[in-house]
Amino acid sequence: MVLAALATVSLSAQVAPERSSRLTVGGYGEVALTRNFYSDNVYRYSHPADYKNDPSHGRFDVPHAVIYLGYDFGKGWTMQTEIEFEHLGTGSAVEKEYTEAGEWELEVEKGGEVALEQFWIQKSFAPQFNVRLGHLVVPVGGLNNAHEPLNYFTVYRPEGEYTILPSTWHDTGISLWGRAGAWRYEVLVIAGLDAFMYDRDSFVKHGAGSPYEFKVANKLGFAARIDCFPVQDLRLSLSGYYGQGMHNSYPNDMWNTRYADIKGHTLLGAFDFAYTGTSFTVRGNADWGFVSDATTISTVKRNLSSNNAPYRKTPVGRNACAAGIEAGYDLLHLFPGGRNPEQKLYLFGRYEYYDSYIPDADQPDYPYTDRHRIAVGVNWLPLPQIAVKAEYSHRFLQSQYNNEPSISLGVAYMGFFTR
């Protein structure tokens, strides 16, 4: 069965070609070992001079380990699931206990660390028209479209998009998609983002999550993506999202006439591209976000969080942005004689700029959110499904703060185990 054939291969957007078995099993995973040569104190941005000479610190992690299961029922009906383990954790859920004077109660039973990130049923009517219903990946931005670790050179996911957008963005709803010639489209209706989960350090990133055992959907969100493949190995893409973020939490606060006119209109727009040639690969992205009524939303959140409500406490800015580009060259291409054609050794560089908090005129500024970052390193692929990664990165903050260099080593896999 075929779901999509993109220039940048994404396991979540493809299923294996025709085979004797109807079952598809696949997945991806990554391990990351990092040494950070800057302070890990939580006050390093509010009092940077006090932590300038702090010792380095190390962090070892398994950011993602994912299993895909797909099945072709026949006659155009297919299903797919994705189970993701993040950081080897379990997670927790929050409930509002009215038997305990309306206090918030934390229960260790469900959360974002072990998640069912996809679970959908699809009916394919034609290559140009397919319908999915269930829990879907929302392909807004280059990272959400191709979030598997062999689709970027860095040890960790591209930092700018990962900071300001939900990642991997998954939500429950319905999707219409298809491909005709050099074009592919997708339109989604999903549960809207929650403005009470927006914040200073990550913009709307946490807005797609839910601390409850259900996803609030008082407001709907609308997302779309269009891909163009003008020439071989090149993809150009536009994507975006719109929804109202206010009045989309629990309990429903629409009765509160004081804030009835506060909508929290949320607009996200993104452009991304990928060129994957025989020896040279380049990828890039540009993302922009807007939230109306940011000042009022920040005030409401601050008042709510004083009652231990499970919302983000810091203010959200009116805008956020991210832009990045990376390029890699296969050094083994210089030595064609006698080498294994399956192996690749990329020398790569990446630059990105992002700011998760661009305030409205009446909001305070927090300049540490304005960042540039460079990364250089190598990716060795002994097989097309496995990558060993090494990099040096340097995060540049404004002059009153301390810069943040680090070195990282990682290993990742991505592929189908059975078809």
Task: Kindly give the residue locations of the regions a language model identified.
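Outer membrane beta-barrel
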Residues: 18-37, 55-195, 218-223, 227-236, ...
